[in-house]
Every structure is written in structure tokens, then in C-alpha cells.
UniProtKB/Swiss-Prot annotation:
Keywords: Antibiotic, Antimicrobial, Disulfide bond, Fungicide, Lectin, Mannose-binding, Plant defense, Signal. Pfam families: Stress-antifung. This is Antifungal protein ginkbilobin-like protein 2. One of its GO terms (biological process) is response to abscisic acid. Residues 1-24 form the signal peptide. Disulfide bonds join C87-C96, C99-C124. The keyword Glycosyltransferase does not apply. Exerts antifungal activity through its carbohydrate-binding specificity. InterPro entries: Cell2Cell_Antifungal, GNK2, GNK2_sf. GO terms for molecular function: D-mannose binding. One of its GO terms (cellular component) is plasmodesma. Residues 28-133 form the Gnk2-homologous domain. It comes from Picea glauca. Alpha-D-mannopyranose binds at N36, R118, E129. The gene is EMB35.
Length: 133
């Protein structure tokens, strides 16, 4: 292989690695959060409604124009959970879903079980409340 061919092949490989890394996982760095000061009492059935809502946001936001609102009716006397999932338009559907799934798994710790929260990662956002949003 000549030096010119080797240089070209090396350049193509470097470019391929850069493109692959740029198209990789979403940016899930925490940007901001704001949480209601009231907490969900331990064992409250609202946890179940909210958990189902978060899964709904994770699964459907990417396929609803990257901006999706939903609610989960209260059960066991618990209030209805309302929420919104949003992703940057510049990321792929799979990255949107991955970002929201990442956030859904972290939101309990970030919000410290608040009855309402807004949490922004670099590539996605979730808001949930006990009232319509």
C-alpha cells in the first residue's frame, strides 16, 4: 500500500469513528430541575399512577412529534398524574426514547418524590404534576 493510499484509508477510518460517535447516545447531562416542595407519602397509590405515566412518556414521545402530553387516572383514591415529555428535534427517535428512559429512571432521585417536578437534561425534558398541564 502506498503512503497516499494509507493516508486516505486512515482519514476514512477516523471520519467513520467521528460520525459514529456523533450519532451515539443522547446527552443526558442534568441541566435544571424544579420540584414541588410537597412529597408523595410513602405507600401512596399516586406512585403507581406516576410510574405508569413516566413509562408512557418514555415510550410515546419520540413517536408523537417529540412533544407528548399524557395522564394516568387516579386509582385507589390517588390523584390523576399528568405529564409531558419533550425531546430536542435534532436527535433521533431512538435517542429520544433512550434519553427519556434515562431520565425516567433518575427522576425519583432528582425530585426526591415530589408531587410535581420539571427536569431538563441536555436532550430531553419531563414534567409531571397532580394537576392538568
Amino acid at each position: 500500500m502506498s503512503m497516499g493510499s494509507f493516508g486516505f484509508a486512515l482519514a476514512v477510518m477516523v471520519l467513520a469513528v467521528l460520525v459514529a460517535s456523533a450519532a451515539g447516545a443522547p446527552n443526558t447531562n442534568l441541566v435544571s430541575s424544579a420540584c414541588n416542595g410537597n412529597k408523595i407519602p410513602s405507600g401512596n397509590p399516586f406512585f403507581n399512577n406516576l410510574g405508569a405515566l413516566l413509562v408512557d412518556l418514555e415510550k410515546n414521545t419520540a413517536f408523537s412529534g417529540f412533544d407528548y402530553k399524557a395522564s394516568r387516572a387516579g386509582s385507589g383514591g390517588a390523584p390523576t398524574a399528568y405529564g409531558r415529555g419533550v425531546c430536542k428535534q435534532s436527535i433521533s427517535q431512538s435517542d429520544c426514547t433512550a434519553c427519556l428512559t434515562n431520565l425516567g429512571g433518575r427522576i425519583w432521585g432528582i425530585s426526591k418524590n415530589a408531587i410535581g417536578a420539571r427536569v431538563q437534561l441536555t436532550d430531553c425534558f419531563i414534567r409531571y404534576e397532580q394537576y392538568s398541564i
